[in-house]
Regions:
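Long extracytoplasmic/lumenal interhelical loops at the membrane interface
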Residues: 264-278, 286, 290-329
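Hydrophobic transmembrane alpha-helices and their immediate junctions
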Residues: 219, 328-368
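Transmembrane signal-anchor hairpin modules in multi-pass inner-membrane enzymes, especially those
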Residues: 1-82, 101, 105-111, 115, ...
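Transmembrane alpha-helices of multi-pass inner-membrane enzymes
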Residues: 36-42, 340, 360-372, 376-403
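Active-site-proximal inter-transmembrane loops
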Residues: 138-154, 260-263, 312-320, 325
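Alpha-helical transmembrane segments of multi-pass inner-membrane proteins
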Residues: 19, 111-143, 152-222, 233, ...
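A membrane-periplasm/extracellular boundary helix in multi-pass inner-membrane enzymes
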Residues: 221-264, 281-286, 294
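Membrane-embedded alpha-helical segments of multi-pass membrane proteins
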Residues: 28-46, 87-98, 159-167, 207-215, ...
Length: 403
């Protein structure tokens, strides 16, 4: 039995990095690898995983959130179809905790996993730029040309979420001496990544998330005083980049138009979100403490729509993770999610690792901003990214610097 555990642990040492390599590229295959990792965890499980020092506050809050989801199945009015959808989505909270425990026990896996993800995202970034001139068989978009929107896997929002983090990783990899070749490479990656969001994508969300990540990077890397100088420079750079991008100029103009007509056109991107922000609090007000139960949003929100035929359009999610938790799990769910976010910032603040603390703070800021305009923990690929990267970075930041 000991030999089986040792061989399983050795195999998992490469399966876990494979998971981080695959989820940006191939969700189906990454889920197969995830299943193998969970089986391997069960095979190698021992009392060491239960020791107090292996657990962190983010892990505790994730388990508490999943417990609330489980309890919510006892009083929800939603049919099993919607309950099962939410259980499958939020089971990733537990999977993330499993990864935290594995990374804590096997710290040598941490860099493998991080570099596996970076390798995948470099492939995505290069492919995005090649899309300007070539039709790539693996790319989601097939129309070459500058001034068009290009993305490789999934959708442009998900790609921009992960590229925003890649830009922060690239900037955090720049070290003294400043003129080294590696620094030039990472600066090039950061520029290409940022421009792919501002010039090669039709989405506005990516720009907001990029700003959130960069502000966190500046705050952690430079401190408050330098941030006062750097922030205006960052705003000017982003404004200049947006002004030079015909794609973003059109999207911003469209956004202003949608905002002005938000009460008249609830099917536009901005109008849809504004309508959700008006009606979801009404649903929450009916059961503000514990919510309506797991999956209840998908059916109960239809009672508040102006037109019944809109139900299938608005029932999938609320375009706001806080409202989503509030509808199903009330103030309890929202506070647990806030506690998770705060605990991530605290882990980063107390960390001795210069790069890892920047990455965790930026990841948390990107998640926070994304949660205000989307439901990232309900989205398949986004939840993989946020929860699994969260697990990795929490483990990295909790390791002694000597390791």
């Amino acid at each position: 039995m000991i030999a089986i555990r040792q061989k399983t642990a050795a195999a998992m040492g490469w399966l876990v990095p494979a998971l981080f390599l695959l989820f940006p590229l191939a969700m189906g295959l990454s889920n197969v690898v995830l299943l193998l990792v969970l089986i391997g965890f069960a095979v190698t499980f021992n009392a060491g995983y239960l020791k107090r020092e292996t657990w962190s506050w983010p892990a505790i809050w994730l388990m508490a959130l999943f417990a609330v989801v489980l309890i919510g199945t006892l009083y929800t009015p939603a049919p099993w179809h919607w309950v099962s959808v939410n259980l499958s989505k939020y089971a990733k909270f537990v999977y993330a905790v499993v990864l935290m425990l594995l990374f804590a026990r096997f710290p040598q896996w941490q860099k493998r996993a991080l570099w596996a993800f970076v390798t995948a995202m470099l492939f995505v970034l290069v492919s995005t730029w090649l899309n300007v001139w070539l039709v790539l068989p693996w790319s989601a978009t097939k129309t070459p040309g500058w001034g068009l929107s290009h993305h490789v896997f999934g959708d442009y929002i998900t790609q921009n979420v992960m590229v925003s983090f890649l830009v922060v990783f690239a900037l955090s990899s720049v070290q003294r001496p400043w003129r080294s070749r590696s620094n030039l490479f990472w600066l090039l990656v950061a520029v290409l990544g940022a421009v792919s969001i501002t010039h090669l994508s039709s989405g506005r969300t990516g720009v907001l998330l990029l700003l959130a990540g960069l502000v966190s990077w500046m705050l952690v890397r430079w401190g408050g005083k330098k941030l006062l100088i750097g922030l205006p420079v960052l705003v000017l750079l982003v404004a200049g980049a947006l002004a030079s991008s015909s794609v973003m100029r059109e999207r911003i103009a469209l956004g202003w138009s949608e905002f002005a007509k938000r009460d008249l056109d609830v099917m536009s991107s901005v109008g849809h979100r504004a309508y959700n922000y008006r009606i979801v609090p009404k649903l929450i007000a009916e059961s503000p403490v514990v919510g309506h139960g797991t999956g209840a949003y998908h059916t109960e929100i239809c009672r508040f729509l102006d037109k019944p035929e809109w139900c299938d359009i608005f029932r999938w999610h609320s375009h706001n993770q806080f409202l989503f938790f509030g509808a199903d799990h009330g103030l309890v769910g929202v506070l647990l999610y806030v506690a998770l976010l705060v605990s991530l910032y605290l882990v980063a603040r107390r960390s001795e690792h210069p790069q890892a603390r920047v990455l965790l703070a930026s990841l948390t800021s990107i998640l926070l901003v994304d949660s205000m305009i989307n439901t990232p923990l309900f989205s398949s690929r986004e939840s993989h990214f946020f929860l699994f990267m969260m697990a990795l970075l929490v483990a990295m930041n909790r390791q002694p610097l000597s390791r």
